[in-house]
Amino acid sequence: MAATLRELRGRIRSAGSIKKITKAQEMIATSRIAKAQARVEAARPYDREITNMLTELATASALDHPLLVQRENPRRAGVLVVSSDRGLAGAYNANVFRRSEELFSLLREEGKEPVLYVVGRKALSYYSFRNWDVTESWSGFSERPEYEHAQEIGETLVKAFMAGVDDEGDDAGADGILGLDELHIVFTEFRSMLSQSAIARRIAPMVVEYSEEDTNEPHTLFSFEPSAETLFDALLPRYVSTRIFAAMLEAAASESASRRRAMKSASDNADDLIKDLTLMANRERQSQITQEISEIVGGANALADAAKK
């Protein structure tokens, strides 16, 4: 019985140590959520306006630009999967991977070969273990992304996308870049502290919606200087980098929210486990004391009987 009691007390100490870790992780995640959420809210207007501006310019100029034109017989689609560098975030990464697998299946059904790019050590580990060919990866900043990180990623993807304009073969071009016909990004959209959703978006070619002409609404007239094509060439890298940066900010906020929720659940479970183990230990100790008392009483009775004889 004593060994069992020692075992229970050891398990209580272990659960207490785990609770300290999960509680600390919960507090860290909580402190980061507010800042991450503020960055998301600050980036959304710029992301929305640059997309709207390019849409209006495309409508006004009727430009035949690679950013706008759906290519004939697209063969390769670049997919950027945004994950985390660390674990302990519940189903955060699993949901992203599940959504990316759905996108891969859809692209293959359309006759397109997915070309994989990843952000975060978890995605690199996940796809490397499954023998996926990861074209390029970036890591070390999933919780605190900066625009410079998005620029670096965007430049890589834009080069591959523009290389796909004149790429008619299945091999890489002279510069060693495998051309892409589409660009997609899979990330976790931050909706609230309690709601995050893994989604996939196409960022190139842009989806331009031409609205029906309404004579009652004023229309913006554009005079392009330099040319509209030159303007789009200049804005394309910035547009892609902006969309990537906005997605990484959403993912960072979602990661912190998911980690906070997971660590709170783990802390609550540790509390429940400690209560259960403490109750078991008290019962075991009570049983041990009862047995010791019984042995003492039995011994005393035996001595009394011996004395009477």
Curated annotation (Swiss-Prot):
It is found in: Cell membrane. It is a peripheral membrane protein. GO terms for biological process: proton motive force-driven plasma membrane ATP synthesis. It comes from the Bacteria. GO terms for molecular function: ATP binding; proton-transporting ATP synthase activity, rotational mechanism. Keywords: ATP synthesis, Cell membrane, CF(1), Hydrogen ion transport, Ion transport, Membrane, Transport. Gene3D superfamilies: 3.40.1380.10, ATP synthase, gamma subunit, helix hairpin domain. GO terms for cellular component: plasma membrane; proton-transporting ATP synthase complex. F-type ATPases have 2 components, CF(1) - the catalytic core - and CF(0) - the membrane proton channel. CF(1) has five subunits: alpha(3), beta(3), gamma(1), delta(1), epsilon(1). CF(0) has three main subunits: a, b and c. Belongs to the ATPase gamma chain family. Produces ATP from ADP in the presence of a proton gradient across the membrane. The gamma chain is believed to be important in regulating ATPase activity and the flow of protons through the CF(0) complex. This is ATP synthase gamma chain.
